Amino acid sequence: MEKKVYADYHGPRCTREHDEKLGQWKYYGIAQKSKVQNREVNYNADCIKENGLFDLATRSYPLLGMQSQRDEDYIEFQILTAKLAHIDGFFVEWGFQEHESNEELLIMMRIAKKLGFEIGINWCDAWHFYSWIEEFHKDAVSREKKLELFENNVQYLIDVLFQTEVGAKIDGHPLIFLFGGGLNIEEFIKIKEKQYQLPRGMKEPYFFARAPIVGKEEKNDVAYELEENEWTKVTDGIFGWIPTRVRDGLATEKFSSWDRYATKEDAEKYVDALYKAMDITESKLHISCVNPEMDNRACASWNKYDLSYISRESGETYESMWKKNLEHKEDADIIYIISWNDYTECHQIEPTLKDGYRELETTRRYASKWKGQKNTGASSDFLLPMRLFYLRKKVRRLNKAGLDVLEYQALLDGIADRIRNRKISEAQLFLEGIERLLQNVEKQIIERKFLLLQKQGRIRTTEGRIILYLEELKEHMTHGGYDSWLSFSYLDETNKSFEFWHKNCKICEIKMENTQCWKQIKIPIFQENIKGLEKELVIKISGEVQIKDVSYFVCTYHVWNE
């Protein structure tokens, strides 16, 4: 059987520009079961900090900054980058077909089809039994009705995902991971035994449960073992997850920011225990794992649990888990990377400002060894999808400025295809060529910059409103494209939130911290969020807040016409 490397894909993450919302880039919470001193977090992702970066819910800033996981340009970047690292597919953390995770799944499938990539499901089955689903199914108040919908969602995945060429399957069996916390044993048995309508050639789905590996610390040493339960008997096997953290963080000064932690050596022992567990449970597939780090402070443990930690150790933790898997090379069918992009728990391998492409380089090197393939390519190859992404954005900006860009888009599609097929030299040449071409095209664009100040009378604040008197600026803003930012100070005197709206579109949401100080912030106001621009741009304020010192900076751009 062909060995596979898959990566967990976390979400949702959105942007005001693309989606009119932020998803999990914004987060406020308290780690309810934590005993550490600092267990509260507040990330206002609409705000641009003094260093020019958005205040994102992460402790490791993405290399490409805040992007939308519904943006096809961004998904193309992610998939092409993953393919260069010998990753075969993403397993989307999914809830049900009406849940917003399904939007990401459908968009991901479209791009995956173009790029020859697989998509699987890590089913967050607990989401299915929250009240969320009742918003879409008013009669789903009983557990029985929710179970009926669960069966419908299995059939939905078969029909929509797994019968396509991108659906992750092994020997004709769709792969579904169950994260746990939703179904009980009896309910799952009924789900698994149901006769689903399968297309010709497809076999029944394989369901894998998260491995119940438990640890115990004695005399500064940790031992792991399988905690046998009924799940290991009724599913088709288990899959590895983040190594269990059992050391007492509060007992040490170094790890006092967390309740629990694990070391690099613990992670290695976890892998050994996982392989033993897969043998004991007679898993139909052996699905091991690698994990670079764990730090759930950015999400305050999802406002529920305690805080735990595994140090990245400058990439050594991730590499050591890969080495352990190489020792068991003949005993595994799949390596599951946890994760591609979970920034809130800081176990992403997607490139960041802090770590660059280091974890992807590690993945490329060890995944090829584990698969028995030649490790082709160079570290510089990873830059190609990023360069393509920025060219995509440049072309979209030229289009907003008034240029016909169909020809350029076709050229970029060709570059994506070359990267997909590892025609690196050709992709490099075409990238250099179109970069030079677009530099010349940009010379046709005229930029104008404007600054409106409250103290000059161009901005007025009234109760519940900020009024920007655009006057002659309106013509420039409607003639082509523009970028704009609003700066202001607010009195941080409560723990409540306030919001800015333009008509029916939310521009920002700020959660205050009751510091009793004036805070100065800067937020972008995207052209996509301003509908029906008039000479007076009225921003409605929702919530009680004092505002002062408002300024509005605009950079307009359009095609130069003689």
Name these PLM-found stretches.
Residues 1-448, 525-528:
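Glycan-processing catalytic domains of CAZymes
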Residues 446-480, 553-562:
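Glycan-recognition and processing domains
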Residues 465, 483-487, 518-522:
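Intrinsic-disorder/low-complexity, polar/charged segments enriched in Ser/Thr/Lys/Arg/Asp/Glu/Gln
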Residues 481, 487-494, 526-528:
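Solvent-exposed strand-to-loop "edge" motifs in beta-rich extracellular domains
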Residues 496-506:
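Short, surface-exposed beta-strand/strand-loop-strand elements in extracellular ectodomains
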Residues 505-533:
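Extracellular carbohydrate recognition and processing domains
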Residues 523, 537, 550-557:
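Extracellular beta-strand elements of beta-rich domains used
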Residues 537-545:
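Short beta-strand-plus-loop segments that form exposed binding edges in beta-rich domains
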